[in-house]
């Protein structure tokens, strides 16, 4: 009874918040708010610098591989488990997925900085 009451309260509250969001007026977007502010002077140039898409892709690839390496860090402690065969199988599976991802990035020229 208590769980169903909590669930119903959550659903009703979520629906109420969604309905209120639809009824609220849209805010006006002012162009002055999106321009750069330089101490009261007119901006000398665009504040939005062009961003290298190649750098972004290399950074995302680094983050993904770094996360996968972080998943391998507990392996020395996991080797003390009773089911060593399963642990080694899962570790080799993770390493092979990591190697396959690296090979794919390399074959797609995702690691080369040339443009």
Curated annotation (Swiss-Prot):
Annotated keywords: Electron transport, Membrane, Mitochondrion, Mitochondrion inner membrane, NAD, Respiratory chain, Translocase, Transmembrane, Transmembrane helix, Transport, Ubiquinone
Pfam families: Oxidored_q4 (PF00507)
Cysteines joined through disulfide linkages: none
Protein topology in the membrane: Multi-pass membrane protein
Stated role: Core subunit of the mitochondrial membrane respiratory chain NADH dehydrogenase (Complex I) which catalyzes electron transfer from NADH through the respiratory chain, using ubiquinone as an electron acceptor. Essential for the catalytic activity of complex I.
Family as reported in the entry's similarity comment: Belongs to the complex I subunit 3 family.
Gene symbol of the encoding locus: MT-ND3
Subunit structure: Core subunit of respiratory chain NADH dehydrogenase (Complex I) which is composed of 45 different subunits. Interacts with TMEM186. Interacts with TMEM242.
Keyword hit for NAD: yes
Organism: Avahi unicolor
Cited InterPro entries: NADH_UbQ/plastoQ_OxRdtase_su3, NDAH_ubi_oxred_su3_sf
Reactions accelerated catalytically: a ubiquinone + NADH + 5 H(+)(in) = a ubiquinol + NAD(+) + 4 H(+)(out)
One term of GO molecular function: NADH dehydrogenase (ubiquinone) activity
GO biological process: mitochondrial electron transport, NADH to ubiquinone
Localization: Mitochondrion inner membrane
Protein name per UniProt: NADH-ubiquinone oxidoreductase chain 3
Top-level class of the enzyme under EC nomenclature: translocase
């Amino acid at each position: 009874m208590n769980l169903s009451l909590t669930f119903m309260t959550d659903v009703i509250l979520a629906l109420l918040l969604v309905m209120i969001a639809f009824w609220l007026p849209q805010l006006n977007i002012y162009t002055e708010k999106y321009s750069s502010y330089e101490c009261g002077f007119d901006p000398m140039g665009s504040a939005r610098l062009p961003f290298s898409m190649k750098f972004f892709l290399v950074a995302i690839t680094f983050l993904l591989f770094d996360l996968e390496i972080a998943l391998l860090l507990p392996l020395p402690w996991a080797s003390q488990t009773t089911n060593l065969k399963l642990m080694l199988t899962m570790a080799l599976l993770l390493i092979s997925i990591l190697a396959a991802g690296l090979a794919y990035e390399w074959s797609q020229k995702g690691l080369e900085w040339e443009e």
